[in-house]
Amino acid sequence: PGLEMHRVTGVVDVGDEDFRIVVEAQSQVPRVYIEFTVVNAGEEVWMTDFLTGNWREVPPTASPLDFSNLGGTMIDIIYAVESPELLGVESVSGIETRRIRGTIQSEELAGLVPGAGGGVDIDVDLWVEVHQSLVYQMVLAGQVLSTDKPDTERLLLLGEFDLPVVIDPPE
């Protein structure tokens, strides 16, 4: 509450379930743009204080997004899609994908968006790579969190699979 996320970028080590993300957001009062970083390394989660830039250890629930089990979470989301409809084949970043549209219950997104509320239909579009069935893009439209506006959209872009990454806790 009080923050509106505009962009999240980062890297995920699916094998170790570690991630590093940079969150760009805007506070509501006063209207100030802020940026902070979240690192999940092993059992520890660290976040920069957006005022001082200093690192501090935080509980996992403090992260606005949870990529610690991204592979499993994406599978859970795909299986939870209701009334899936194939819209056709589209290119995403030069990759041939199948675009699938359906709905999902907001609580099914709790693995990705901590605090996701229950009982709200969320529209979901998935762009799934034709040959390996990797999700390259996902759009979630609707009120996932109780603090979201009803027309909130979340765009998740995935790519550069199988590249080595090293995610260490901050020093």
Put a short name on every predicted segment.
Residues 7-16, 36-45, 124-130, 156-163:
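Extended lipid/amphipathic-ligand handling interfaces
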